[in-house]
Amino acid sequence: MLNIQPTQSIVNNQPKSDQKKQKPADLLKEFYDKTGNRN
């Protein structure tokens, strides 16, 4: 459950239209690109 929560919070912060277009993996990639925490 713990590793689901960060992903869910990212999805919840996205507009509804973006949720339908993007998969959770895409949201994570976008999030890491924005924060610069991608390894």
UniProtKB/Swiss-Prot annotation:
Residues 17-39 have a biased composition (Basic and acidic residues). It comes from the Eukaryota. Residues 1-39 are annotated as: Disordered. Residues 1-16 have a biased composition (Polar residues). This is Uncharacterized protein DDB_G0281597. The lineage of its organism: Eukaryota, Amoebozoa, Evosea, Eumycetozoa, Dictyostelia.
